[in-house]
Swiss-Prot record:
Keyword Transport (UniProt): no
GO biological process, one term: catabolic process
Protein name listed in UniProt: Salicyloyl-CoA 5-hydroxylase
Recorded catalytic activity of this chain's protein: 2-hydroxybenzoyl-CoA + NADH + O2 + H(+) = 2,5-dihydroxybenzoyl-CoA + NAD(+) + H2O
Functional note: Involved in the degradation of salicylate via a pathway involving coenzyme A derivative. Catalyzes the aromatic hydroxylation of salicylyl-CoA to yield gentisyl-CoA.
PANTHER family for this protein: 3-(3-HYDROXY-PHENYL)PROPIONATE/3-HYDROXYCINNAMIC ACID HYDROXYLASE, BLR0106 PROTEIN
EC number: 1.14.13.209
Induction: By salicylate.
SUPFAM superfamilies for this protein: FAD/NAD(P)-binding domain
Entry GO MF terms: FAD binding; oxidoreductase activity, acting on paired donors, with incorporation or reduction of molecular oxygen, NAD(P)H as one donor, and incorporation of one atom of oxygen
Disrupted gene: phenotype observed: Cells lacking this gene are unable to degrade salicylate.
Family the UniProt entry places it in: Belongs to the aromatic-ring hydroxylase family. KMO subfamily.
């Protein structure tokens, strides 16, 4: 059996090693256009709870993290000059170049042929191989060549991001939110060695343009960094990194693209890692996902009784649902980062801002499992400003008073637990009553219409909007438009348990939470 891997990233190297180990008679060749020590990017980060499948196949990653990486338990959120910390997160990171070096050693020891500075330009060059694994990254050329079969799609985020390192040593995963003269910028930062931290910066397109950071020529040769942006961000974040410099490595602005493919295989060609799928870096490690792909593909191919087509079908059958779950869970987090400037400016209390951030993908209860003391502090903050806990706090608007934040919903009435009701009418563009229903869209493409309806409702002087229909994410985005852009109270209607309802109110996403009669 002859197997070619296009790309010597972690996924490709790990797959080649595992396959060669399980099938020593196979000829496994890795083609890589760059040199062995060429590495773009800085560190790779992993959650402690997600490494079991990789470790079971080969402990190389755990060994790299233990011997060469950095480990931490807390996440820190910096905003408005204050710092909020939450524990129980259990994460580790290592320099990408170090991990690649160890993976190259493993592959070499198993007898994998690694051909560096050897770029495959024509698929015909690999005609004599029985299997070709395409692991050439998110911008995969071969995925594009076989686009009719793979059916690739990309959802491009509106936010801009750029990847740097810094010699300032963060002590764990830290999110730094900085309001500057041109807009709000935020950094995802974490240590990757004893002398370097990763420093990823995001901002919205308008702030990026106002700061004059749109002048970098994307045709600049690979490897060169955007020095103007580097200087700007060093100055903007100077106090946060104690004047330390940023370190560039092919650092240039981009928009994150969530990539999917209708099929992961085309004949003997199969996609692996970022070539097949991506998930926003705020919740998913592309390296981890690629290495898990490698484990699954090597396992299905390792059984001699199974043909290559059967193995590829089983690989996709096993991995696709797991990957899609990660991508789906990443969407609320990606959306948060597309709107974080609004949140920085809307939430004056660092406690509520941090809780809003930390619950973008999980509810209060799951956060409490990780750090009960932190959630107790958030609850205490609420109690200092209100009469009772989030769901037990009375709600007042105009002449109406409801005893709690839980309501029952009908077509023309929003009813409190004591039977008190707020009259509701559907949005119609005509004069409104006390409250107006806004129907959230089923997809984010429909949000502009719903947000326009919120604006018209606010301008008409109504007391409250109720948001129903749509998805959990679009309902929240419509409600936040009302609350944060127009200071208009919002009720969200859905099948919410008390934990999720508490999270919505405590985080400032909604004022009332209801279910239908």
């Amino acid at each position: 059996m002859k197997v070619a891997c296009i790309g010597a990233g972690p996924g490709g190297l790990f797959f080649a090693t595992l396959l060669k180990r399980s099938r020593p008679d196979a000829e496994v060749v890795v083609f890589e256009r760059n040199r062995p020590d060429d590495t773009f990017g800085f560190g790779v980060v992993f959650s402690d709870a997600t490494l079991d499948a990789i470790d079971a196949a080969d402990p190389v990653l755990s060994e790299a993290l233990e011997k060469h990486g950095r480990h931490w338990d807390d996440i820190e959120v910096r905003v408005h000059g204050e710092r909020e910390r939450v524990g129980g997160m259990g994460m580790a990171a290592v320099v990408r170049k170090t991990l690649l070096s160890l993976l190259q050693e493993r592959a070499r020891a198993e007898g994998v042929q690694m051909r560096f500075q050897d770029e495959v330009r024509d698929p015909a060059e690999l005609d004599d191989f029985d299997l070709v694994v395409v692991c050439d990254g998110a911008n995969s050329r071969f995925r594009t060549l076989f686009a009719d079969d793979f059916g690739p799609t990309a959802e491009v985020a509106s936010a801009k991001f750029i990847w740097f390192g810094t010699t300032y040593m963060f002590d764990g995963l830290t999110f730094v939110h900085q309001d500057g003269p041109h807009g709000v910028f935020a950094a995802h930062a974490y240590p990757i060695s004893d002398s370097l931290s990763t420093f990823i910066v995001e901002t919205d397109a308008d702030s990026w343009a106002r700061a004059g950071l749109d002048a970098f020529d994307p045709a600049t040769p690979l490897g060169m960094s955007d020095e103007k942006t580097k200087s700007y961000l060093e100055d903007l974040f100077r106090a946060q990194i104690d004047g330390h410099p940023l370190v560039g490595n092919n650092s240039r602005w981009a928009n994150f693209a969530t990539r999917r493919a209708r099929s992961w295989r085309s004949g003997k060609w199969v996609l692996l890692g970022d070539a097949a799928h991506t998930a926003h870096f705020s919740v998913g490690s592309g390296t981890k996902m690629a290495m898990e792909d490698a484990v699954a593909l090597a396992e299905t191919l390792g059984e001699a009784s199974r043909s290559v087509p059967e193995a590829l079908d089983l690989y996709e059958e096993r991995r696709r649902p797991k990957v899609e779950r990660i991508q789906n869970s990443a969407r609320p987090s990606l959306s948060w980062w597309e709107h974080f400037g609004r949140y920085v400016r809307s939430f004056d209390a660092p406690t509520q801002f941090a809780f809003h951030f930390l619950t973008r993908s999980i509810p209060r209860g799951k956060l409490a499992v990780r750090d009960a003391a932190y959630v107790d502090r958030v609850d205490g903050w609420w109690l200092r400003h209100h009469e009772a806990g989030p769901l037990k706090t009375p709600f007042r608007v105009g002449p109406y008073r409801l005893p709690t934040r839980r309501v029952t919903v009908g077509d023309d009435l929003l009813t409190g637990t004591d039977g008190t009701g707020i009259p509701m009418v559907p949005f119609s563009g005509q004069p409104f009553g006390a409250g107006v229903w806004i129907d959230a869209p089923d997809t984010e493409e429909g949000l502009p219409l719903a947000l326009d309806q919120v604006r018209e409702t606010a301008e008409a002087g109504v007391l409250l909007v109720g948001v129903r229909g749509g998805t959990a994410l679009t309902r929240v985005l419509v409600a936040e438009e009302a609350r944060l852009a127009h200071s208009l109270p919002a009720a969200i209607v859905g099948a919410y348990d008390d934990d999720t309802a508490t999270t919505l109110v405590l985080s400032g996403r909604a004022d009332l939470v209801g279910g239908t009669k």
